[in-house]
Amino acid sequence: MKQKNRKYDQYTHHFLSIMYKLFKENPEIFKIKKLRGIHGICDYENDEIQIDYRKYLIPTIIHEVMHYYYPDWSETKILIEERKIINYLSVRQIKHIIKRFANIL
């Protein structure tokens, strides 16, 4: 059985804490929409994170929250970090993200 990397465990936990804080303190910024050609967008001007519900929901939420918190990161860096988190999440953590996100809609 593959052992978990403690560094990624701490990193994932830290990011989830940031994301849950955003869910709790600013739930109104999340909008569910049909978007054309994209899965989601972090709209800084209108302080919105738009998510297309027809696409990959969990990775898109993580990706757009990263854009929200790290606006100076390149798209490439966001994609790399998103993949690290997605690949490291447990089933329990995925369920928790879904529950918390559903509660803000």
Name each region found by the language model:
Residues L16-I58, Y68-P71, T76-N87:
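Active-site scaffold of zinc-dependent metalloenzymes
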Residues M1-L22:
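Glycine-rich short-loop/terminal segments
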Residues E64:
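Walker B catalytic acidic pair
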Residues Y11-I18, K77, Q93-H96:
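Exposed alpha-helical structural elements
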